C-alpha cells in the first residue's frame, strides 16, 4: 500500500528540523547502503551516530507517535531510527530495493529490524528544487511522489524505487523503515481499510450496535495475524 500522510510535522517542528539540518555536517550517503544499492546511490547523509541525527530523529518519532493514520496503516512494532539525506547538484539514487533487514546501530547493531514498510518524510518545499521525485514501482504501475514539506509517504519495503536527479536547489528528507506487527502487506491494507470504515461509521452513525461487532472483527483479525 502506497499512502501519503499529510502534515505529520507541524510548521514549528519543520522549522526546528530545518534549522538543525541546515548547519549539519553531511557525509557520503553510501555509508548506509548495501552492496547493490551503493552502486546506484549518490547523495549526502547525516551520520547515524551524530548528535544532530539523534535529536532530529527523536523529533520525528514524537511526531509519528501522534499520527493516528501512520499507526493505523503501519501497525508498527519497531521503527528503525530515522535517517536524513540531501540531494543537490544532479545527485540521484537509481532503482533499488531496500535491504530486508537493518541492524539498529543505536542498540549496538544487535537488534535486527525487518523492513516491512519504507517511509520518506519530505523536509523541503517542492518549489525549492527541481527533480527529486520518489518513483515507486507498485502493483498499479509507476508512481511518482513529490510532497509538500512535512508530509510523509509510506510504501511496502519490497518495492523497487528510485530518486530522480535534483537539478536545482536541494531536496532534504527523512527516511526510515518500520517492522510491522503484520508482515503481510495485504493484511495491513485490509485492516487499515476496516479501521477507516469503522471511524467513518462512528462519525456518521454514532452508537450503532454494528460498530461493536465490526470493532470486534478488527481486533480478532489483528489477534490472529499479529506477530508480537
From Swiss-Prot:
Q: Where does the Fe2OG dioxygenase domain start and stop, copy by copy? A: 78-180
Lineage top rank: taxon? Bacteria
Cross-referenced Pfam families, in alphabetical order? 2OG-FeII_Oxy_3, PKHD_C
User: Is NADP found in the keyword set?
Assistant: no
EC numbers on record: 1.14.11.-
Q: What class of enzyme is it?
A: oxidoreductase
Q: How is the cofactor bound?
A: Binds 1 Fe(2+) ion per subunit.
**What residues does Fe cation bind to?**
96, 98, 161
Transmembrane domains' residue ranges: none
Which InterPro entries does the record match to this protein? Oxoglu/Fe-dep_dioxygenase_dom (IPR005123), PKHD_C (IPR041097), PKHD_hydroxylase (IPR023550), Pro_4_hyd_alph (IPR006620), Pro_4_hyd_alph_FE2OG_OXY (IPR044862)
Binding, 2-oxoglutarate: 171
HAMAP family the UniProt entry points to? Hydroxyl_YbiX
The name this protein goes by in its record: PKHD-type hydroxylase XCV3086
Instruction: Please tell me the species this chain comes from.
Output: Xanthomonas euvesicatoria pv. vesicatoria (strain 85-10) (Xanthomonas campestris pv. vesicatoria)
